[in-house]
From Swiss-Prot:
The chain crosses the membrane at residues 163-183, 216-236, 259-279. It comes from the Eukaryota. Residues 992-1008 have a biased composition (Gly residues). The keyword Transferase does not apply. Residues 33-63 have a biased composition (Low complexity). This is Probable ubiquitination network signaling protein acrB. Residues 68-83, 131-143, 580-589 have a biased composition (Polar residues). Keywords: Coiled coil, Membrane, Transmembrane, Transmembrane helix, Ubl conjugation pathway. It is a multi-pass membrane protein. Residues 602-788 form a coiled coil.
Length: 1019
């Protein structure tokens, strides 16, 4: 939108003539006219249009396949007048506007685009229509009406827009509202810059997320979290309220109420929806009405009277229903993304420091990227502040501090552009879309001919009916711009007054126009008339060249008529960078190229600096060429001196004469020597007779001696052959003898080995038998010792048994005496007529009467039983000694006592007696290996009983005392009636028979072949 003049002047002071001004430096005000940034009318330049004009050539340079590279001009005619030029003496102009680039060109003439292509970019000038009053200002250049200008400005009202959109959304049918929510939700998955093949395959755009929007993973995670809360904690009323909150988010986004300082819009919209849901809630209505009725504030009649005034939507008769799953999913997604965006904005606002406040008024274009800067700094993690310069590029403060303007990467520019685009309201987005579509349409129309056919040349313009005063660019170089022009002659232009100085024209050929570069009269511009072309046959009448330009800089070239000082056209051209390596190294180009022309003073200064740089470069090249020439000349001189020296040294006459005389002398000496040798050869051909005779005698002697030598050689050969035969026979005999000797030695060795083996085997066999005999003897000795030990134990046990039996007999005798005394005492007490107790007979007792008890009952009736005064007792148990294991069995003839044996009579037995006897079953029973297959020893009979089944010994004590045998006797085993004589438990394998005998030590053994028996007999 066009700015006012005051705003333009204030914003113009913050601009630098070569681009964006440094943020930390004071910017000097420009003292030139308003021909900056490619706009001739600096007060009415449109920001959107200028930005589109800057970005369009750069964006289309890589996409158009066929673009002429030698022209760059576009012209817009019939503009508004501007201030006067300081150096060109041009009071007004046509406000012609042209933009040029080395990569593309297009022309705008009265709003209609046309393309000439090729080297001729298109019509860039037009004949000025003179008014009838002779005024220099065109009637079409009148100022714009203020009312008309104000009517074109759309005021930003985000609150009104948001509320209007919210009301509109709430009135839509459910089906249409669902469709709107679906379209809005689908926009969150699309990149802000549009889908492309590169963005679909980029990890940053898919997973990391573009600037201003979360990544795909974050979206899915937030949607899942909100969906979980929706299903678990949200009841029906809350779900319907959240569904309307999604409408609020859509309205805020489309109306632009969520950006800037319009935070109250969110609260207002949410409050409206909340109040509406609270009023519509049946529970709240019942609560309020019941409270009002109970407090008698409103009567039921009044309520029924005014209830029909309420809308039908507020009078609910049934509770709300849950929304459908599709609308629930869309609402969850919209609210989740809204919450994510709010969190990201709050984090970015808290993280980025607030900029310092200054008293200067900030340009609206420069401040448009302030919020973008905050979010971009938050997204990229960089603390470098940035802003959008006037040339449409992002400039960082760190670059200005270093004194250089550095461009940010394309990724950051894309992020910031996406953020600015996302913060635009719905109406601004529609306007931006319309501008973009129209610009693309105009550009496609302008380049239609170039894209379809080959580039056009000047020859293609023959026969075309074009207006007079046509100027076009033919070639753009790093330091020069070449142009051509048509015929400017007319009936009114017969006079040649007011012309500028001509560089190459005569007095009869005046220049119809002159050139101003960036508002300054350009003295190095040359214009020449084409003389060889016939009039009317060619469009080219004038050719010119603008030299002295700097590479990679933007210029505004103005073509002004010489007679009326009116601007024919204005062309904005940017010179390409220099491709010469030497010139690039010598001339330093600015690090940040400017995309708008400089002021006249700056242009002249840059031209002077460029000319001085070229002059210095040429001087340096000249000095370098001089040095190279000096080196080459010195080398040539050295070679010339060498050749002269060789020439002088090779043409000396004296040396040549001496050399020729020397050669002649050598020839004569050689000839003399040859003649002498020939004479000697002639003399040697004639031999004397005496010498011939001597030679024949010597030859005969030699032959005789030779025959003797041959015969001696034959004899020697025969003798050698005979001796060789003898030696061979002897060698054969010797070899046979050696072979026999070796065979005998091998046989002797084999026999010796056999002998040694036999001897060792014999010795080993004897030793083995002796060892076995010694082992057998040792085992028999051990067995004999073991038998003697057992015999001694048996004798000791027998003696102890006899002693115990004698002691037991004595004790039984004492017991019998005690029993007899007790019986006598009882009989005496029974025979006594007195009472049994001092108190008399006890009550309930029946004293015995002598008449009732017969005397025969007081005596014992059976020998095996005992009776005491008519009382019969069972037979007594056997003595404990009778149950113990003893090899001697005996039975006592005395009756046993009915009383228990006293404890002092239990004498401890011998340790040998306490041990299990060798005749006991516990001693015999033991687990055997595979060699002993019986659980009991096979040496004992099957009728051998253990102690639990053994019969008591029936042994008379008198016989035991009468017949005492020795402890080592073998006949004591026969006393046991329950046992039978068995063989010794240690029967040897070598014994053939069995028998009994006694030795001096009391041991017994059997087997006549046993060494132990022999040892026992000898001992």
């Amino acid at each position: 939108m066009p700015r006012s003049s005051a705003t333009a002047r204030k914003s113009h002071s913050n601009r630098h003539e070569n681009g964006s001004a440094n943020t930390g430096k004071k910017v000097a005000k420009q003292k030139s006219n308003g021909h900056l940034n490619g706009n001739l009318n600096g007060g009415s330049a449109s920001s959107s249009l200028s930005s589109s004009q800057v970005d369009l050539p750069s964006s289309r340079s890589s996409s158009d396949p066929v673009v002429p590279t030698t022209t760059a001009a576009s012209t817009k005619l019939n503009g508004t007048p501007d201030s006067s030029k300081g150096d060109c003496n041009a009071p007004d102009h046509l406000n012609g506007y042209a933009k040029g680039n080395a990569d593309m060109s297009y022309v705008q003439n009265d709003g209609v685009a046309s393309q000439t292509g090729g080297d001729v970019a298109g019509p860039a000038s037009r004949r000025t229509e003179k008014s009838a009053t002779g005024s220099k200002r065109s009637p079409s250049n009148a100022s714009v009406n203020p009312l008309q200008l104000a009517s074109t400005i759309l005021k930003s009202c985000p609150m009104y827009d948001t509320i209007a959109i919210l009301i509109f959304l709430l009135q839509l049918p459910p089906m249409v509202l669902t469709l709107v929510q679906f379209l809005f939700a689908s926009l969150t998955f699309l990149p802000p810059s549009g889908a492309s093949a590169g963005s679909l395959t980029s990890n940053f755009d898919i997973f990391q997320g573009p600037a201003g929007t979360p990544s795909l993973g974050t979206m899915i995670a937030m949607d899942g979290f909100c969906l979980l809360i929706w299903g678990l904690f949200m009841w029906t009323w809350a779900q319907n309220f959240a569904l309307d909150l999604a409408h609020v988010q859509v309205a805020i986004t489309l109306g632009g109420g969520g950006f800037g300082k319009n935070g109250g819009v969110n609260t207002l919209c949410v409050g409206i929806v909340l109040i509406m849901h609270l009023v519509r809630s049946k529970g709240i209505q019942d609560f309020v009405i019941g409270h009002l009725l109970s407090s008698n504030i409103i009567s039921p009649d009044m309520l029924s009277q005014y209830s029909h005034l309420l809308p039908t939507e507020f009078r609910r008769t049934e509770p709300q229903t849950s929304p459908s799953w599709l609308r629930s999913l869309l609402a969850v997604h919209i609210l989740a993304q809204a919450g994510t965006a709010m969190a990201r904005r709050s984090m970015a606002k808290n993280r980025t420091p607030n900029p310092p406040r200054t008293g200067k008024r900030i340009d609206t274009e420069a401040s448009a990227g302030s919020q973008t800067q905050i979010d971009s700094a938050f997204e990229s993690g960089a603390s470098v502040s940035s802003y959008i310069g006037a040339d449409g590029q992002i400039v960082t403060s760190a670059a200005h501090k270093d004194g250089r303007d550095r461009l940010l990467s394309a990724k950051k520019r894309r992020r910031q552009a996406n953020q600015v685009r996302s913060r635009q309201p719905f109406w601004a987005a529609l306007a931006s879309t319309k501008i973009t579509v129209m610009r693309e349409y105009e550009h496609s129309r302008a380049l239609s001919k170039t894209a379809r056919s080959l580039p056009m040349t000047e020859d293609d313009l023959q026969g075309l009916s074009l207006d007079d005063g046509l100027v076009w660019i033919t070639e753009i170089d790093s330091s020069t711009i070449k142009f051509a022009a048509g015929d400017f002659s007319s009936a009114d232009d017969s006079s040649g007054s007011g012309a500028c100085e001509a560089g190459c024209l005569g007095s009869e050929d005046m220049e119809p126009f002159y050139v101003c570069v960036n508002g300054a009269l350009w003295a190095t511009a040359t214009i020449c008339k084409v003389h060889d072309a016939p009039k009317g046959s060619s469009m080219v009448h004038w050719r010119g060249e603008i030299s002295g330009l700097a590479p990679n800089c933007a210029y505004t070239c103005s073509f002004v008529r010489s007679d009326t000082d009116e601007e024919i056209c204005v062309i904005s051209v940017k010179t390409p960078a220099n491709n010469d390596a030497e010139q690039v190294s010598s001339v330093s180009t600015p690090p940040h190229p400017s995309y708008r022309p400089s002021s006249p003073t700056t242009t002249l200064k840059n031209s002077i600096v460029n000319a001085e740089a070229k002059l210095n470069e040429k001087r340096s090249r000249l000095r370098k060429a001089k040095n190279d020439h000096k080196l080459i000349i010195s080398k040539i001189r050295k070679e010339l001196d060498n050749y002269n020296h060789r020439l002088h040294s090779g043409t000396d006459e004296n040396r040549q004469k001496q050399r020729s005389l020397q050669l002649e002398r050598n020839i004569r000496q050689t000839e003399e020597a040859t003649a002498l040798l020939e004479d000697q050869l002639d003399n040697l051909e004639n031999v004397p007779e005496e010498e011939l005779r001597k030679w024949s005698d010597q030859k005969a002697k030699y032959e005789h001696e030779l025959g003797l030598l041959n015969s001696a050689k034959e004899e020697l050969a025969s003798a050698r052959s005979a001796i060789a035969r003898e030696v061979s026979s002897l060698e054969t005999e010797l070899s046979s003898a050696i072979q026999r000797r070796e065979r005998l030695q091998s046989r002797r060795t084999r026999i010796n080995e056999q002998y040694e083996r036999i001897v060792s085997a014999n010795a080993q066999g004897l030793n083995e038998r002796e060892r076995r005999a010694a082992e057998q003897f040792a085992r028999e000795q051990d067995q004999a010792k073991l038998e003697a030990t057992f015999n001694e134990q048996f004798a000791t046990i027998g003696q102890s048994v006899q002693e115990y039996q004698l002691r037991a007999q004595q004790i039984w005798q004492q017991c019998d005496a005690i029993e007899q005394a007790i019986q006598q005492q009882h009989q005496q007490m029974l025979l006594d007529p007195g009472p049994l107790t001092p108190e008399g007979n006890l009550p309930g007792t029946n004293p015995f009467s002598e008449s009732a008890l017969p005397l025969g009952a007081l005596t014992s009736t059976a020998p095996s039983s005992r009776s005491l005064l008519g009382l019969s007792f069972p037979p007594l148990k056997s003595s404990p000694l009778q149950t113990a294991s003893s090899p001697v069995g005996a039975s006592s003839s005395h009756p046993t006592s009915p009383v228990q044996q006293p404890s002092y009579l239990n004498f401890p037995t011998s340790p040998l007696v306490n041990a299990s006897s060798h005749l006991d079953s516990d001693f015999v029973y033991r687990h055997r290996s595979f060699s002993n297959r019986s659980a009991r020893s096979s040496l004992y009979g099957s009728d051998f009983m253990d102690s639990s089944r053994r019969q008591p010994f029936q042994l008379d004590l008198s016989e035991l005392l009468a017949d005492k045998r020795s402890p080592g006797s073998d006949s004591n085993t026969a006393l046991n009636s329950g046992l039978r004589p068995v063989s010794s438990p240690f029967q040897r394998a070598g014994s053939r028979g069995s028998g009994s005998g006694s030795n001096g030590s009391g041991g017994s053994g059997s087997g006549s072949g046993s060494p132990s028996s022999v040892y026992g007999k000898t001992n």
